[in-house]
């Protein structure tokens, strides 16, 4: 985020986190500030109390800036230190809890005290570059497997990489931390909540203990601008709408009550420009196929059901494409049991468009991911037979005809994007 200040404006200092290399005095709990200075306030690890000068003079100015865009998680509290704040005495609580906020306060007099001149969220937050590579992993043939296949920035699928994690099927995967990926949940012979992180070189890590209820047939997608993700829906004995958030380090949180119709096999994908996402389609508790959708805000809040568009179906796949925040949901199986290759565009406002005739072999229980920054790929799946075919998606959202497959034919797998480097 760029902050432009006029000549003679307060100098910005850096406080409230341990970054001594920047020259500031580290303090993660509280900081007494001086008049006519500016401060970067980093609340990544904890809340911070800002104590204002005890004897301010008229015209004194202080600027406080949310360094890590984390005030929404860990707020700051203003201690006016005996002076009034917006006309209220020091006994009033003054808190700021909006990510990306910039607070510019000026001291007026003994009556009004400190008055905010600006109290705005910085909207033009830096946006991470799109990922360049992808990974398909795990799945089922005649038994579960743990093999993976990398996808280069040119859309070429590599041969099998030997399994590292426990073989499983009906799992989910998503990007996290900006340039990394995570596979989690699924069925290893019984339902599982273990996870396998993927670093930004595409190396799959060994099994790590999971969090949340062991489930299968969920879906997952990243959200926001801080490298976070969400796993939602699925089943364990019964269908659920529960969700598990993932932080930017790949740690999965415990179960949280969800929103929308409980179901299995939805499809999830990003849309928009600031980290929104959508879950769509699936099979509900009455075993009916649905075309409803649920939007995810860039803070990870899952919305209630939206009106359905397109043919009710499940076991579809989705990828982003282009540079204007659009996505594509395609393939799957409909309520009549027929596999399809139709596609539905998701606009940058999260609206799902009607069915459009597709390309490539109709199939379901496949996976998809973005690659090359603005393109996508659908691969593997089952229909008339288990396959390893792939279909590339160009930056305009056009699905290409079949590409001869590479890697072990399988279905019930998952895929995600990773790496900022081509």
What are these regions (language model features)?
Residues 23-25:
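Short, positively charged, Gly/Tyr-enriched micro-motifs
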Residues 27-30:
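Short beta-strand edge segments in extracellular beta-sheet folds
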Residues 33-36, 72, 128:
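A short, polar/charged loop/turn motif at coil->beta-strand junctions and beta-hairpin connectors
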Residues 17-21:
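Beta-strand-rich extracellular modules
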Residues 93-96, 104, 119-422:
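Kelch-like beta-propeller repeat domains
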Residues 35-38, 59, 100-101, 305:
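Glycine-centered loop/turn motifs
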Residues 1-15, 44-124:
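Acidic, glycine/polar-enriched metal-coordinating patches/loops
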């Amino acid at each position: 985020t760029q902050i432009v200040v006029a000549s003679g404006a307060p100098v910005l200092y850096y406080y409230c986190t341990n970054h001594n290399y920047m020259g500031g005095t580290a303090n993660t709990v509280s900081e007494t500030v001086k008049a006519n200075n500016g401060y970067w306030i980093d609340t990544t690890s904890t809340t911070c109390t800002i104590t204002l000068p005890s004897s301010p003079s008229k015209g004194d100015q202080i600027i406080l800036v949310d360094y890590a865009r984390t005030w929404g998680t860990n707020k700051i509290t203003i201690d006016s230190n005996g002076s009034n704040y917006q006309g209220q005495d020091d006994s009033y609580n003054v808190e700021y809890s909006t990510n990306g906020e910039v607070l510019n306060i000026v001291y007026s007099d003994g009556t009004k005290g400190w008055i905010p001149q600006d109290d705005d969220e910085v909207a033009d937050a830096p946006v991470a570059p799109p990922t360049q590579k992808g990974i398909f992993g795990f799945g089922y043939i005649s038994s579960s497997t743990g093999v993976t296949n990398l996808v280069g920035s040119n859309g070429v699928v590599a041969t099998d990489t030997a399994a590292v994690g426990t073989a499983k099927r009906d799992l989910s995967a998503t990007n996290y931390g900006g340039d990394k990926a995570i596979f989690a949940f699924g069925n290893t012979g019984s339902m599982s909540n273990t996870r396998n992180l993927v670093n930004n070189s595409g190396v799959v890590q060994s099994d790590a203990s999971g969090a949340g209820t062991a489930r299968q047939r969920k879906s997952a997608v990243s959200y926001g601008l801080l490298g976070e993700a969400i796993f939602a829906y699925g089943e364990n004995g019964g269908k659920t709408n529960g969700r598990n958030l993932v932080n930017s380090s790949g740690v999965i949180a415990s179960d949280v009550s969800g929103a929308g119709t409980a179901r299995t096999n939805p499809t999830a994908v990003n849309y928009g420009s600031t980290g929104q996402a959508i879950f769509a389609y699936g099979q509900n508790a009455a075993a009916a196929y649905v075309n409803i959708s649920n939007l995810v805000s860039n803070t990870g809040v899952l919305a209630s059901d939206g009106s359905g568009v397109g043919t009710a179906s499940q076991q579809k796949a989705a990828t982003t494409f282009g540079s204007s925040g659009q996505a594509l949901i395609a393939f799957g199986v409909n309520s009549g049991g027929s596999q399809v290759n139709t596609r539905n565009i998701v606009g940058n406002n999260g609206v799902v468009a009607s069915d459009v005739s597709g390309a490539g072999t109709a199939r379901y229980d496949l996976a998809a991911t973005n690659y090359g920054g603005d393109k996508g790929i659908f691969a593997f799946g089952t229909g008339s037979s288990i396959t390893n075919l792939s279909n590339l998606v160009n930056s305009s959202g056009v699905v290409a005809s079949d590409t001869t497959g590479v890697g072990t034919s399988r279905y019930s797998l998952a895929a995600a994007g990773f790496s900022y480097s081509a």
